[in-house]
Amino acid sequence: MITIIGNSVAGIGAIEAIRKVDKQRPITVISKEPYVAYGRPVISDFLKGKAKEEKLLSYRRKDFYKENNVNLVLNEEIVDIDVKKKKVISASGNEYKYSKLLIATGGVPFIPPFKGKDLKNVFTFTTLDDAKKLLSISKDIKKAVVIGGGLIGLKSAEGLHAQGVKVSIVELMDRILSLAFDKVSGSIVENRMSDVGIDVYTEASTEEILDDGQGNVRGIRLKGGREIEGDIVVIAIGVVPNASFAKKAGIEMNRGILVDDHMETNIKGIYAAGDVAEAKQFLYEQKMLLPIWPDAYKQGRVAGYNMIGIERVYDGGLAMNSIELFGVSTISAGAHTPQNPEGYEFLIDVDEKRYRYRKITLKDNKVVGFIFVGDIDRAGIFVGLIKDKVDVSSFKDKLLKKDFGFIDLPCE
């Protein structure tokens, strides 16, 4: 009996790997949400009104679970693992046995202990239900404050803006998307957001969510005393691995659940994959959280094969972010902005007026990272250069050319 906790992309990857080889082994999938697997990256399209719920829920065929002989249990949250008896226990007291277990529970919103965080009309934005709540209330409000200028914050802001809401974004760092952008690219996207009417406050620390005296939100107060009005507040500072129950069971954790190259934890027969897992990072072969959709699927497949005795090795993920904001496409990957720039080389082409920026980061004549804004064509080639550790010294002068392509690569 294989039991999978979590019903998103990593769990789906595991199911498909298992069923490719073994059509009969019992699989139970347990999810605390009421939905079949859906495309979490596109909940922002739902909020914008560009995607219906049916589209989100079509990540896999309607009969996917039946066709793959999967016992799907919805609205059931697992809160404990009994390692000795090989069973998991839900909040409602139900027990599910396993011979092999995959933890694919993803992440949960990180909520700092702000005063006022429990007021009415304080939201998060990581699930379809979150998007439904924001879409519903957007028709009755005029202003929103989004705390956090990362991917989740910007996509929630874009969705609310599309519904006619005046949005203010508050970000602690000196730029939005601080993990994906450097200062120049962050500034370009900030300018685009300002052009469409979104206010962006960087290097701004939220001190309190303000009460209107009736238990409702009226805005936030920053350190220093400045107040920003809002009928709702979206807390979008980031996510943390949803793994407290795993820690209780003795599973080793750092920031996430630590796994080996087979996606197995320190407890034999228990695996982890996706946003909850801390796995090998490709570039430096160190373990880290990589909350990236394709990598979560890949990790799930590796775990699935290994759970049925077919050895597969996870070769590591690459930090990568791809996002379109208000018509400006962006993608970044790898170590594009190292903290210590010594020993690195940077190739840069920028046109801020046209919202365009290309930065390629090299070390020892190898591409280790890049940021593209506005023009993201051929990004896949650069991902390949990073993963294959190609020496680019013979064609380095061509890397920034608009028509750079496979024809420019060495033949061998």
Enumerate the language-model features and the residues they cover.
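C-terminal catalytic lobe of FAD-dependent flavoproteins
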Residues: M1, R218-I220, R226-E252, V328-P410
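Beta1-alpha1 glycine-rich phosphate/pyrophosphate-binding loop at the start
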Residues: M1-N71, A157-A180, D377, I381
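Short hydrophobic core segments
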Residues: I5, Y96-G106, I147, I228-G238, ...
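Mid-to-C-terminal Rossmann-like scaffold of FAD/NAD(P)H-dependent oxidoreductases
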Residues: N7, K20, V276-R378
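Residue-level detector of alpha-helix initiation sites
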Residues: S8-I12, P34, G107-P109, L128-D129, ...
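A Rossmann-like FAD-binding core segment of flavoenzymes
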Residues: Q24-P26, K66, L72-S90, Y96, ...
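Glycine-rich dinucleotide-binding loop and its adjacent helix/turn
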Residues: T105-Q163
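FAD-site-proximal beta/loop scaffold in flavoenzymes
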Residues: D118-K139, D211-R221, R226-V302, S394, ...
